[in-house]
């Protein structure tokens, strides 16, 4: 069971430096760095890592769709054996800040972030696993899958039914609705959890 992030001195150094750099260079992003560090953000990413371990899926090369700063998820994925995490973002600040959180992995080639709207542009490389833990913020994943029919991989999708936020444009009421939106028929795992916040 995956119950925590291994908080090593390297992680501490990168995350401390990120906080200092955001304060100095990206003060307008400070609130977002707090939002990405909530207990519910960690819970949802721990859940992903735990289920991936239980399913024994091949997951050497992972694409994150809208992975934001990828602070928790990258640490967890590398910890369970992923060789490469490639985050696809549309926000240049998110890319730059994600490189700060994940400097140790960027430097050794295990983390990349590209500015690319993957809902309108095809993927140019293969991945074993595609993770979208923020489906509520974008078009249904069926659009992505139709754009990339040759991509033969597993999908991990998370969403919410919390419609109170302006940027939640695509909430779902159930796991079944999420799978239906993505046109995924062969579901290896389905579940839901109540997050702290």
Short names for language-model regions:
Residues 1-58, 90-129, 133:
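S-adenosyl-L-methionine
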Residues 83-89:
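Conserved SAM-binding motif I beta-strand of class I
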Residues 57-70:
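Conserved class I S-adenosyl-L-methionine
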Residues 69-82:
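Conserved SAM-binding loop of SAM-dependent methyltransferases across substrates and taxa
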Residues 139-197:
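C-terminal substrate-binding/active-site "lid" region of AdoMet-derived donor-dependent transferases
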Residues 69-72, 91-93, 119-121, 133-139, ...:
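Short acidic, S/G/P-rich loop/turn micro-motifs used as interaction or catalytic elements
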Residues 60, 126-128, 153:
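Conserved acidic residues
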């Amino acid at each position: 069971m995956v119950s925590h992030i291994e908080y090593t001195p390297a992680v501490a150094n990168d995350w401390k430096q990120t906080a200092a750099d955001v304060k100095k260079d990206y003060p307008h992003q400070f609130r977002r760095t707090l939002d990405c560090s909530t207990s519910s953000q960690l819970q949802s990413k721990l859940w992903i890592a735990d289920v991936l371990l239980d399913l024994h899926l091949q997951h050497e090369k992972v694409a994150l769709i809208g992975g934001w700063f990828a602070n928790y998820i990258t640490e967890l994925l590398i910890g369970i054996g992923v060789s490469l995490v490639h985050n696809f973002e549309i926000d240049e600040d998110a890319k730059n800040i994600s490189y700060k959180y994940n400097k140790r992995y960027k430097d050794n080639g295990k983390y990349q972030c590209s500015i690319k709207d993957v809902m309108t542009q095809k993927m140019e490389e293969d991945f074993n696993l595609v993770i979208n833990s923020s489906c509520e913020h974008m078009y249904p994943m069926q659009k992505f899958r139709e754009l990339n029919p040759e991509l033969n991989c597993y999908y991990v999708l998370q969403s919410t039914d919390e419609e109170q936020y302006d940027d939640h444009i695509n909430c779902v009421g159930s796991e079944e609705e999420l799978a239906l939106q993505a046109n995924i028929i062969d579901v290896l795992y389905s579940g839901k959890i109540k997050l702290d916040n």
